[in-house]
Amino acid sequence: VHAAVAAAAVMAGGRPLWETTDTEWDVLFEIGVRGVLNLARTAVPALLRGAQPRSGRFVALASAAAHRGLWHLAAYNAAKHAVVGLVRGLATDLRGTGVTATAVSPGSTSTAMLAATAALYDLPDVDEFAGYQLLDRLLRPEEVAATVCWLCGESSSAITGTVVHADGGFTA
């Protein structure tokens, strides 16, 4: 095993934090955070034993929402912030092993999950999210995937314990 990518996510909420249900909170953290933890528990030992010692890659998808509060999505913000913290802690634990751990924080990307988010806000069109990004368009999934692939490759060997913002300028 050379690389492991944690990319599972779910959208829940769409209401103020004080109205967020325990179920919504639990779903966000179970899938978005515990999923990363479970992959790390399984994949990191294999990365440490990998075919190319001292060169494994662990990448987790966070979100631009980890770095900027979003209206009525505080629980989602918190879950994605937890992913960033988990990756930073993992990178520290991997110090000196040659295995890196990084997070990618995409902005609004043209996916089914963004469509679900639009539905939470009763928006008729996901393109309304494009205005939050300096590129003034939605990201394409393949743009985010290219960032992840780069982080899984040798040319990113000096990148660990940090976040790569593939967010179209959302967090600028």
For the regions a protein language model found, what residue spans apply to each?
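Residue(s) in the substrate-gating loop at a strand-loop-helix junction
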Residues: S63
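Active-site helix of classical SDR
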Residues: A40, A79, V87
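Substrate-binding pocket helix/loop in short-chain dehydrogenase/reductase
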Residues: R15-L17, E24-F29, F129
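Short, small/polar-rich loop/turn modules that mediate ligand/substrate recognition or access, typified
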Residues: S55, R95, T100, I159-G161
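C-terminal substrate-recognition "lid" of short-chain dehydrogenase/reductases
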Residues: R137-A166, T171
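Alpha-helical segment proximal to the catalytic Tyr-Lys
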Residues: P45, T92-D93, S157
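Active-site loop immediately N-terminal to the catalytic Tyr-X3-Lys motif
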Residues: W18, P53, R68-A74, G96, ...
